[in-house]
Every structure is written in structure tokens, then in C-alpha cells.
């Protein structure tokens, strides 16, 4: 019974994070927050999986390191976008 709770809670939160990521497409900051929530739930599921199989947690630490680098890169893009355009709306941001 506890194993079902270990797997169902992160999956529900992962799906909730995906829903927030898809529904908040106007602001870059809300997209970055929901993306970090998704990565955190993936880390939690990976940690549970590795502990169930009695593996070492070095891979989860590497995953956490790369997710921190991804978050820092996203925040730097957000800061540069706000400096050039004045806001974080995707409507005012043009790739061309």
C-alpha cells in the first residue's frame, strides 16, 4: 500500500506540473517555475526508483546538478529578456 503512495503522489504532482506548464504560456517566469516543479518531481521519482532497487544515488545527484544549471540558464534568459523588452510576455518577444 505504501508503494502505491510512493508512486502515485509524484505522478499526480508531475501531471499537475505539466498542466500548469501548458496552461501558463503567456509569462516566462510562470513557465520556468512549473518547469522546475516538473524537474523536481522527476528527481523525486528517480530517487524513489533508485532506493527501491538499492542502487547508489550518484546519478540522482548528477541529475540534480544539471537541473540547477538549467534553472540558472532559464533565469539568465529571463533577466536578459526583461532588460531588452521590459516584460516577460511572449507576445512582445519576437524571434526574428
Swiss-Prot record:
It is found in: Mitochondrion membrane. GO terms for biological process: mitochondrial electron transport, NADH to ubiquinone. The chain crosses the membrane at residues 2-22, 28-48, 62-82. GO terms for molecular function: NADH dehydrogenase (ubiquinone) activity. It holds the Pfam family Oxidored_q2. It is a multi-pass membrane protein. InterPro entries: NADH_UbQ_OxRdtase_chain4L/K (IPR001133), NUOK/Mnh_C1-like (IPR039428). It comes from the Eukaryota. Its EC number is 7.1.1.2. One of its GO terms (cellular component) is mitochondrial inner membrane. It catalyses: a ubiquinone + NADH + 5 H(+)(in) = a ubiquinol + NAD(+) + 4 H(+)(out). It is an enzyme of class 7 (translocase). Coiled coil: none annotated. Keywords: Electron transport, Membrane, Mitochondrion, NAD, Respiratory chain, Translocase, Transmembrane, Transmembrane helix, Transport, Ubiquinone. Belongs to the complex I subunit 4L family. Core subunit of the mitochondrial membrane respiratory chain NADH dehydrogenase (Complex I) that is believed to belong to the minimal assembly required for catalysis. Complex I functions in the transfer of electrons from NADH to the respiratory chain. The immediate electron acceptor for the enzyme is believed to be ubiquinone. This is NADH-ubiquinone oxidoreductase chain 4L. The gene is mt:ND4L.
Amino acid at each position: 500500500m505504501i508503494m502505491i503512495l510512493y508512486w502515485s503522489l509524484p505522478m499526480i504532482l508531475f501531471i499537475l506540473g505539466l498542466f500548469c506548464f501548458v496552461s501558463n504560456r503567456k509569462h516566462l517566469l510562470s513557465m520556468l517555475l512549473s518547469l522546475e516543479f516538473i524537474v523536481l518531481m522527476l528527481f523525486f521519482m528517480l530517487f524513489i526508483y533508485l532506493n527501491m532497487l538499492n542502487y547508489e544515488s550518484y546519478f540522482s545527484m548528477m541529475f540534480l546538478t544539471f537541473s540547477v544549471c538549467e534553472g540558472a540558464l532559464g533565469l539568465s534568459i529571463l533577466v536578459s529578456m526583461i532588460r531588452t523588452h521590459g516584460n516577460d510576455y511572449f507576445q512582445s518577444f519576437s524571434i526574428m
